[in-house]
Design a protein with these regions (language model features):
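Peripheral (often C-terminal) accessory segments that flank ATP-dependent C-N-forming ligase machineries
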Residues: 282-360
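Active-site nucleotide/adenylate-binding loops and adjacent lid/helix of ATP-dependent enzymes
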Residues: 94-183, 187-234, 355
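ATP-binding N-terminal substructure of ATP-dependent carboxylate-amine bond-forming enzymes
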Residues: 1-100, 107, 122
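Short, low-complexity Ser/Thr-rich regulatory SLiMs
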Residues: 186-190, 245-249, 325
Protein backbone atom coordinates (compact mmCIF):
# COMPACT_ATOMS: atom_id res chain seq x y z
CA UNK A 1 0.00 0.00 0.00
CA UNK A 2 1.24 3.48 -0.87
CA UNK A 3 0.27 6.37 1.39
CA UNK A 4 0.28 10.00 0.27
CA UNK A 5 1.06 12.54 2.97
CA UNK A 6 0.41 16.26 2.69
CA UNK A 7 3.44 17.72 4.43
CA UNK A 8 6.95 16.37 4.73
CA UNK A 9 8.03 17.41 8.21
CA UNK A 10 8.93 15.33 11.24
CA UNK A 11 5.38 14.02 11.71
CA UNK A 12 5.34 12.69 8.16
CA UNK A 13 8.80 11.26 8.77
CA UNK A 14 7.64 9.39 11.87
CA UNK A 15 4.54 8.12 10.07
CA UNK A 16 6.82 6.61 7.43
CA UNK A 17 9.09 5.07 10.05
CA UNK A 18 6.03 3.42 11.60
CA UNK A 19 4.49 2.34 8.31
CA UNK A 20 7.51 0.85 6.59
CA UNK A 21 7.48 -2.32 8.75
CA UNK A 22 3.83 -2.76 7.72
CA UNK A 23 4.88 -2.89 4.07
CA UNK A 24 3.72 0.64 3.32
CA UNK A 25 5.41 3.06 0.93
CA UNK A 26 5.10 6.83 1.09
CA UNK A 27 4.92 9.93 -1.08
CA UNK A 28 5.11 13.40 0.48
CA UNK A 29 3.84 16.62 -1.06
CA UNK A 30 5.71 19.55 0.44
CA UNK A 31 7.07 22.78 -1.09
CA UNK A 32 10.22 22.73 1.05
CA UNK A 33 13.37 21.55 -0.76
CA UNK A 34 14.72 20.13 2.49
CA UNK A 35 11.58 18.38 3.78
CA UNK A 36 12.92 15.99 6.41
CA UNK A 37 10.49 13.19 5.49
CA UNK A 38 11.78 13.07 1.91
CA UNK A 39 14.49 10.56 2.80
CA UNK A 40 11.76 8.02 3.55
CA UNK A 41 9.69 8.26 0.40
CA UNK A 42 8.99 10.09 -2.84
CA UNK A 43 9.03 13.88 -2.54
CA UNK A 44 6.67 15.90 -4.72
CA UNK A 45 7.94 19.43 -4.29
CA UNK A 46 4.92 21.64 -4.87
CA UNK A 47 2.63 24.12 -3.19
CA UNK A 48 -0.29 22.66 -1.26
CA UNK A 49 -2.71 24.27 -3.70
CA UNK A 50 -0.96 23.03 -6.86
CA UNK A 51 -3.74 20.97 -8.43
CA UNK A 52 -1.52 19.37 -11.07
CA UNK A 53 0.77 17.89 -8.43
CA UNK A 54 -2.16 17.05 -6.18
CA UNK A 55 -3.68 15.06 -9.03
CA UNK A 56 -0.32 13.37 -9.61
CA UNK A 57 -0.20 12.41 -5.95
CA UNK A 58 -3.76 11.06 -6.07
CA UNK A 59 -2.92 8.93 -9.11
CA UNK A 60 0.14 7.41 -7.42
CA UNK A 61 -1.23 6.44 -4.00
CA UNK A 62 -3.98 4.33 -2.43
CA UNK A 63 -5.03 6.98 0.08
CA UNK A 64 -3.95 10.36 1.43
CA UNK A 65 -3.52 11.75 4.93
CA UNK A 66 -1.91 14.95 6.24
CA UNK A 67 0.59 15.78 8.95
CA UNK A 68 -0.62 19.26 9.94
CA UNK A 69 -3.87 21.20 9.93
CA UNK A 70 -2.63 24.34 8.19
CA UNK A 71 -3.11 22.63 4.83
CA UNK A 72 -6.06 24.33 3.06
CA UNK A 73 -9.33 22.44 3.44
CA UNK A 74 -9.81 23.03 -0.29
CA UNK A 75 -6.74 20.89 -0.95
CA UNK A 76 -8.27 17.94 0.88
CA UNK A 77 -11.63 18.49 -0.81
CA UNK A 78 -9.94 18.47 -4.23
CA UNK A 79 -7.99 15.30 -3.49
CA UNK A 80 -11.14 13.60 -2.19
CA UNK A 81 -12.56 13.61 -5.72
CA UNK A 82 -9.86 11.16 -6.82
CA UNK A 83 -8.62 9.21 -3.80
CA UNK A 84 -9.77 8.45 -0.23
CA UNK A 85 -8.51 11.09 2.23
CA UNK A 86 -8.48 10.64 5.99
CA UNK A 87 -9.27 12.60 8.08
CA UNK A 88 -12.02 14.21 6.00
CA UNK A 89 -12.11 17.70 4.53
CA UNK A 90 -14.95 18.56 6.93
CA UNK A 91 -12.92 17.48 9.96
CA UNK A 92 -10.03 19.62 8.74
CA UNK A 93 -12.29 22.61 8.05
CA UNK A 94 -13.50 22.63 11.64
CA UNK A 95 -10.22 21.77 13.35
CA UNK A 96 -8.16 24.41 11.54
CA UNK A 97 -10.49 27.29 12.49
CA UNK A 98 -10.78 28.13 16.17
CA UNK A 99 -14.27 29.62 15.75
CA UNK A 100 -15.69 26.46 14.19
CA UNK A 101 -13.79 24.35 16.72
CA UNK A 102 -15.05 26.23 19.79
CA UNK A 103 -18.58 26.40 18.39
CA UNK A 104 -18.55 22.62 18.00
CA UNK A 105 -17.42 22.18 21.61
CA UNK A 106 -20.29 24.39 22.74
CA UNK A 107 -22.85 22.55 20.60
CA UNK A 108 -21.67 19.20 21.99
CA UNK A 109 -21.88 20.34 25.60
CA UNK A 110 -18.11 20.27 26.12
CA UNK A 111 -16.91 22.99 28.52
CA UNK A 112 -14.57 25.50 26.89
CA UNK A 113 -13.43 29.05 27.74
CA UNK A 114 -15.77 31.91 26.80
CA UNK A 115 -15.05 33.05 23.24
CA UNK A 116 -16.04 35.87 20.86
CA UNK A 117 -15.42 36.23 17.12
CA UNK A 118 -13.23 39.25 16.34
CA UNK A 119 -13.18 40.94 12.93
CA UNK A 120 -11.95 44.41 13.90
CA UNK A 121 -10.38 46.43 16.69
CA UNK A 122 -13.88 47.65 17.58
CA UNK A 123 -15.00 44.03 17.97
CA UNK A 124 -12.02 43.42 20.24
CA UNK A 125 -12.76 46.44 22.40
CA UNK A 126 -16.38 45.33 22.83
CA UNK A 127 -15.40 41.72 23.56
CA UNK A 128 -12.90 42.78 26.22
CA UNK A 129 -15.61 44.85 27.86
CA UNK A 130 -17.82 41.75 27.89
CA UNK A 131 -15.34 38.99 28.79
CA UNK A 132 -12.97 41.07 30.88
CA UNK A 133 -9.23 40.78 31.38
CA UNK A 134 -7.05 38.81 31.34
CA UNK A 135 -7.98 37.26 28.00
CA UNK A 136 -6.22 35.71 25.03
CA UNK A 137 -6.54 36.97 21.46
CA UNK A 138 -5.84 34.26 18.88
CA UNK A 139 -5.95 34.19 15.10
CA UNK A 140 -8.71 31.86 13.94
CA UNK A 141 -6.31 29.88 11.74
CA UNK A 142 -2.59 29.11 11.36
CA UNK A 143 -1.69 29.36 15.03
CA UNK A 144 0.65 26.76 16.57
CA UNK A 145 3.44 26.56 19.16
CA UNK A 146 2.31 29.83 20.72
CA UNK A 147 2.24 31.71 17.41
CA UNK A 148 -0.73 33.80 16.34
CA UNK A 149 -1.83 34.75 19.84
CA UNK A 150 -1.32 37.33 22.55
CA UNK A 151 -2.29 37.41 26.20
CA UNK A 152 -4.07 40.64 27.16
CA UNK A 153 -3.59 41.42 30.84
CA UNK A 154 -4.27 45.16 31.10
CA UNK A 155 -6.19 47.76 29.04
CA UNK A 156 -3.00 49.02 27.38
CA UNK A 157 -2.43 45.54 25.93
CA UNK A 158 -5.66 45.80 23.94
CA UNK A 159 -4.68 48.90 21.98
CA UNK A 160 -3.60 48.03 18.44
CA UNK A 161 -3.49 44.29 19.12
CA UNK A 162 -5.83 43.37 16.27
CA UNK A 163 -3.44 45.00 13.79
CA UNK A 164 -0.47 43.42 15.58
CA UNK A 165 -1.88 39.98 14.75
CA UNK A 166 -2.29 40.95 11.11
CA UNK A 167 -5.86 42.35 11.08
CA UNK A 168 -7.14 38.86 10.29
CA UNK A 169 -10.13 37.00 11.73
CA UNK A 170 -9.46 36.31 15.40
CA UNK A 171 -11.04 34.85 18.50
CA UNK A 172 -10.95 36.36 21.97
CA UNK A 173 -10.99 33.75 24.71
CA UNK A 174 -11.50 34.26 28.39
CA UNK A 175 -8.36 33.47 30.37
CA UNK A 176 -8.58 30.16 32.24
CA UNK A 177 -6.88 29.89 35.67
CA UNK A 178 -5.97 26.26 35.11
CA UNK A 179 -4.08 23.97 37.47
CA UNK A 180 -2.63 21.85 34.68
CA UNK A 181 -2.58 21.15 30.95
CA UNK A 182 -3.32 17.64 29.72
CA UNK A 183 -3.85 16.05 26.35
CA UNK A 184 -5.54 12.90 25.14
CA UNK A 185 -4.51 11.04 22.01
CA UNK A 186 -7.41 9.13 20.45
CA UNK A 187 -7.62 6.92 17.38
CA UNK A 188 -10.81 6.02 15.52
CA UNK A 189 -11.04 3.39 12.80
CA UNK A 190 -13.16 3.46 9.66
CA UNK A 191 -15.74 1.24 11.36
CA UNK A 192 -15.99 3.55 14.38
CA UNK A 193 -13.86 1.51 16.77
CA UNK A 194 -12.15 3.99 19.10
CA UNK A 195 -9.18 3.67 21.44
CA UNK A 196 -7.51 6.12 23.77
CA UNK A 197 -4.01 6.49 25.15
CA UNK A 198 -3.49 7.55 28.78
CA UNK A 199 -3.84 11.25 29.54
CA UNK A 200 -0.58 13.15 29.30
CA UNK A 201 0.59 16.02 31.53
CA UNK A 202 2.15 18.78 29.41
CA UNK A 203 4.56 21.58 30.26
CA UNK A 204 5.06 24.46 27.84
CA UNK A 205 7.71 27.17 27.54
CA UNK A 206 6.81 30.30 25.55
CA UNK A 207 3.93 28.40 23.97
CA UNK A 208 6.10 25.49 22.78
CA UNK A 209 5.67 22.03 24.29
CA UNK A 210 8.66 21.22 26.48
CA UNK A 211 7.73 18.04 28.37
CA UNK A 212 4.99 15.41 28.24
CA UNK A 213 4.57 12.78 30.95
CA UNK A 214 2.12 9.92 30.45
CA UNK A 215 -0.18 9.37 33.42
CA UNK A 216 -1.33 6.22 35.18
CA UNK A 217 -5.00 5.91 36.19
CA UNK A 218 -5.64 9.65 35.85
CA UNK A 219 -8.90 10.58 37.64
CA UNK A 220 -10.05 12.62 34.62
CA UNK A 221 -9.33 9.92 32.01
CA UNK A 222 -12.97 8.85 31.67
CA UNK A 223 -14.19 12.45 31.37
CA UNK A 224 -11.59 13.24 28.71
CA UNK A 225 -12.61 10.14 26.77
CA UNK A 226 -16.28 11.14 26.98
CA UNK A 227 -15.65 14.63 25.61
CA UNK A 228 -13.34 13.31 22.91
CA UNK A 229 -15.81 10.62 21.84
CA UNK A 230 -18.46 13.28 21.22
CA UNK A 231 -16.17 15.09 18.78
CA UNK A 232 -14.99 11.94 17.01
CA UNK A 233 -18.57 10.75 16.46
CA UNK A 234 -19.76 14.19 15.36
CA UNK A 235 -17.06 14.34 12.67
CA UNK A 236 -17.27 10.63 11.77
CA UNK A 237 -13.53 10.87 12.22
CA UNK A 238 -10.91 8.43 10.94
CA UNK A 239 -7.34 8.52 12.24
CA UNK A 240 -5.55 9.95 15.26
CA UNK A 241 -6.81 13.12 16.90
CA UNK A 242 -5.25 15.00 19.81
CA UNK A 243 -7.37 16.80 22.39
CA UNK A 244 -5.84 19.50 24.60
CA UNK A 245 -7.59 20.30 27.88
CA UNK A 246 -7.16 22.65 30.81
CA UNK A 247 -7.60 21.14 34.27
CA UNK A 248 -9.99 23.47 36.09
CA UNK A 249 -11.73 22.95 39.44
CA UNK A 250 -11.45 19.17 39.29
CA UNK A 251 -12.82 19.05 35.74
CA UNK A 252 -11.73 19.76 32.18
CA UNK A 253 -12.18 22.59 29.71
CA UNK A 254 -11.40 21.91 26.07
CA UNK A 255 -8.68 24.10 24.61
CA UNK A 256 -8.22 22.75 21.09
CA UNK A 257 -8.04 19.70 18.87
CA UNK A 258 -5.45 18.63 16.32
CA UNK A 259 -6.64 16.33 13.49
CA UNK A 260 -3.36 14.43 13.24
CA UNK A 261 -0.61 12.72 15.16
CA UNK A 262 0.62 15.08 17.87
CA UNK A 263 3.78 16.14 19.68
CA UNK A 264 2.31 15.12 23.05
CA UNK A 265 1.88 11.59 21.71
CA UNK A 266 5.50 11.05 20.66
CA UNK A 267 6.15 9.07 23.85
CA UNK A 268 3.99 6.26 22.45
CA UNK A 269 6.76 5.15 20.07
CA UNK A 270 8.59 3.45 22.94
CA UNK A 271 6.00 3.84 25.69
CA UNK A 272 2.91 2.09 24.28
CA UNK A 273 2.14 -1.27 22.72
CA UNK A 274 1.31 0.46 19.43
CA UNK A 275 2.44 4.02 18.71
CA UNK A 276 0.15 6.87 17.67
CA UNK A 277 1.90 6.84 14.28
CA UNK A 278 1.25 3.17 13.58
CA UNK A 279 -2.31 3.42 14.88
CA UNK A 280 -3.03 6.41 12.63
CA UNK A 281 -1.87 4.39 9.64
CA UNK A 282 -3.84 1.35 10.76
CA UNK A 283 -6.97 3.50 11.06
CA UNK A 284 -6.73 5.25 7.69
CA UNK A 285 -5.75 2.02 5.92
CA UNK A 286 -8.70 0.09 7.34
CA UNK A 287 -6.49 -2.23 9.40
CA UNK A 288 -7.24 -3.43 12.96
CA UNK A 289 -6.25 -0.92 15.63
CA UNK A 290 -3.35 -1.75 17.91
CA UNK A 291 -3.28 -1.69 21.70
CA UNK A 292 -2.91 1.74 23.33
CA UNK A 293 -1.75 0.24 26.63
CA UNK A 294 1.27 1.81 28.31
CA UNK A 295 4.56 -0.07 28.60
CA UNK A 296 6.33 1.17 31.72
CA UNK A 297 6.39 4.84 32.73
CA UNK A 298 7.09 7.24 29.88
CA UNK A 299 7.88 10.84 29.06
CA UNK A 300 8.93 12.93 26.06
CA UNK A 301 11.22 15.97 26.07
CA UNK A 302 11.48 18.22 23.01
CA UNK A 303 14.77 19.47 21.64
CA UNK A 304 14.18 23.06 20.55
CA UNK A 305 16.71 24.76 18.28
CA UNK A 306 19.46 22.18 18.73
CA UNK A 307 19.86 18.50 19.52
CA UNK A 308 22.40 17.84 22.30
CA UNK A 309 25.40 15.68 21.36
CA UNK A 310 24.08 12.28 20.34
CA UNK A 311 26.59 10.38 22.48
CA UNK A 312 25.43 12.23 25.59
CA UNK A 313 21.73 11.66 24.92
CA UNK A 314 21.98 7.94 24.28
CA UNK A 315 24.31 7.48 27.25
CA UNK A 316 21.33 8.15 29.53
CA UNK A 317 19.73 4.88 30.53
CA UNK A 318 16.16 4.31 29.29
CA UNK A 319 16.55 7.22 26.81
CA UNK A 320 15.62 6.95 23.13
CA UNK A 321 16.73 9.71 20.75
CA UNK A 322 14.63 10.85 17.78
CA UNK A 323 16.63 13.22 15.54
CA UNK A 324 14.55 14.83 12.78
CA UNK A 325 17.45 15.58 10.43
CA UNK A 326 16.41 19.23 10.25
CA UNK A 327 18.72 22.24 10.21
CA UNK A 328 19.10 23.69 13.69
CA UNK A 329 17.25 26.99 14.17
CA UNK A 330 16.14 28.91 17.25
CA UNK A 331 12.58 28.05 18.28
CA UNK A 332 12.40 25.07 15.92
CA UNK A 333 11.59 21.52 16.99
CA UNK A 334 14.55 19.50 15.74
CA UNK A 335 14.24 16.31 17.76
CA UNK A 336 13.02 14.74 20.97
CA UNK A 337 13.96 12.18 23.57
CA UNK A 338 11.61 9.49 24.81
CA UNK A 339 12.13 7.97 28.22
CA UNK A 340 10.64 4.62 29.23
CA UNK A 341 11.39 3.49 32.76
CA UNK A 342 10.27 0.77 35.15
CA UNK A 343 8.75 3.17 37.68
CA UNK A 344 7.84 6.82 38.13
CA UNK A 345 10.70 7.61 40.51
CA UNK A 346 13.25 6.43 37.95
CA UNK A 347 11.44 8.34 35.21
CA UNK A 348 11.59 11.59 37.15
CA UNK A 349 15.31 11.10 37.77
CA UNK A 350 15.98 10.48 34.08
CA UNK A 351 13.91 13.53 33.08
CA UNK A 352 16.25 15.66 35.22
CA UNK A 353 19.26 14.21 33.38
CA UNK A 354 17.84 15.02 29.94
CA UNK A 355 16.82 18.50 31.07
CA UNK A 356 20.40 19.07 32.24
CA UNK A 357 21.65 18.21 28.75
CA UNK A 358 19.17 20.62 27.20
CA UNK A 359 20.38 23.38 29.54
CA UNK A 360 24.07 22.92 28.63
Amino acid sequence: MKIGVIGGGQLGRMLALAGTPLGMNFAFLDPAPDACAAALGEHLRADYGDQDHLRQLADEVDLVTFEFESVPAETVAFLSQFVPVYPSAEALRIARDRWFEKSMFKDLGIPTPAFVDIQSQADLDAAVASIGLPAVLKTRTLGYDGKGQKVLRKPEDVVGTFAELGSVSCLLEGFVPFTGEVSLIAVRARDGETKFYPLVHNTHDSGILKLSVASTDHPLQALAEDYSSRVLKQLDYVGVMAFEFFEVDGGLKANEIAPRVHNSGHWTTEGAECSQFENHLRAVAGLPLGSTAKVGESAMLNFIGVVPPVEKVIAIEDCHLHHYGKAFKAGRKVGHANLRCADMATLQAQIVKVEALIAE
